[in-house]
């Protein structure tokens, strides 16, 4: 049986070539088929086909030839049932007849009606291997149309369409013993302009089936749809069809869980009180009106930073940050820190300390993100003058979208803070509550927030200016290792496309992370840092200022030798005694980073022709 079907050839195979020339349109079926069947199907032709084992092929061609020899008027009147209303002929051709409809054509029992000028493939039943071999020669082999012209098999015939991911098969109601199946074949290389009602002549409109595609076919492949299943036609979803492809910048909401000032004036920003070095939770979420919708593109990167509230030039801001850093006990002291709480790491990833005053991380807008941050600088730490009002500070959050191909954030918000030391925030709140309770309502000139309405949650205020880029601070002491300076924040979207470990690297990355091209290799000339010490002997009350020419142990020896007439070559050891009583050997690192403008009591001891110096911290 298998050998018998292997010897049979297909009746008609037209390859679906992408460059196949467009055939001219015919106004009638008779003209189309008669132009195709130019030579009559003689008995000799049938005999030759029978000798080659193509009885079915000869029968099929005879069916088609005899069918189109019948006049058009007789065919139209013969296929119309008497009990139905007359309807346009194109609806007859594009629908599968019911079981009760009987064909009245004497030339044969099977009919295959195909849209004119559309390539298609016809193969014999059970010749799956033959169909596979021929599909390998087609230009667009992702769709194969199989039409049975013999007795309808009892199993399901399916046409798999790989690009759409579903199979289109003959409906179960069509499986009956009467082999009267008709299949409508569409060529996807046709555009919707060819099917529009405004550009087609009346005759072409009458023969054209409705299409559920709203856009031009994009692939030159075939698709098969039965009339009852045309509703299954679904265009592929492109990136522009996503519900949430581009992140909207107006739907983000950030909150800080900290105490707010009770003395809020109308129109002013909310003042939040923080304790220096204490961690406070910051919550980030996307407050879209379409709640419950899962956004397919949902990763964003946010940068939390401490910035100055007042408008200052970039040079002034860097000068204030450098002064603050020079007053710290360690060069690694940061302006803002993030806690490694498990609650935080479950909602964020890719945490990077991109600067001393900024931290960036990635989070999913489908979920709520929470981070714990601490601020390590006071408002009064930026000036050497005592008793002056400190500089106001802001916590600012910039959010960048994955699809944002620029350095401009999609959303920016801030809240004004005032940082206290040693639980000063709680004392400030209690002091305001006490003053508010003593003040009479009639004497109040500014509207105060009632104490019973006070909450510990501050909502960040949106900032409309998205063009001004904040200043990132990176101390000069790290230039020798990192070869980078303080510059303006610039986060490219390429950084958002990958996710690494929780702490991707630490505390800094490469120049590419900031969107700044690597600088040319120039010799960096920077002035040596000067160190000033205040020293006095135990018997003295006034301090002497020791200015070290070089911030090193050798520079300290030279300064002491010049000031106290101690021979430089006879100085043996120099010790530093901390306030805790710890005695350590003085070295270059301590002199350079931990001794500037500190006060010491100097003790000089002579033993064995050498001097031992001890600097006791006061």
Swiss-Prot record:
- What gene, per UniProt, encodes this protein? Grhl1
Briefly state the modifications made to the protein after translation. Methylation at Arg-9 and Lys-116 may be involved in regulating transcriptional activation.
**PANTHER family given in the database record:** GRAINYHEAD-LIKE PROTEIN 1 HOMOLOG (PTHR11037:SF16), TRANSCRIPTION FACTOR CP2 (PTHR11037)
Tissues expressing this chain: Isoform 1 is highly expressed in brain, pancreas, tonsil, placenta and kidney. Isoform 2 is highly expressed in brain and liver. Expression in the skin is confined to the suprabasal layers of the epidermis and to the hair follicles.
Q: Where is the composition biased (Basic and acidic residues)?
A: 76-92
Location of this chain's protein in the cell: Nucleus
Q: Region labeled Disordered — which residues?
A: 76-100
Annotated stretches, region: Interaction with DNA: 380-389, 427-430
The organism's taxonomy opens as: Eukaryota, Metazoa, Chordata, Craniata, Vertebrata
Please give the Gene Ontology molecular function terms for this protein: chromatin DNA binding; DNA-binding transcription activator activity, RNA polymerase II-specific; DNA-binding transcription factor activity; DNA-binding transcription factor binding; protein homodimerization activity; RNA polymerase II cis-regulatory region sequence-specific DNA binding; sequence-specific DNA binding; transcription cis-regulatory region binding
Q: Which GO terms describe its cellular component?
A: nucleoplasm; nucleus
Q: What is this protein called?
A: Grainyhead-like protein 1 homolog
Q: Which family does it belong to?
A: Belongs to the grh/CP2 family. Grainyhead subfamily.
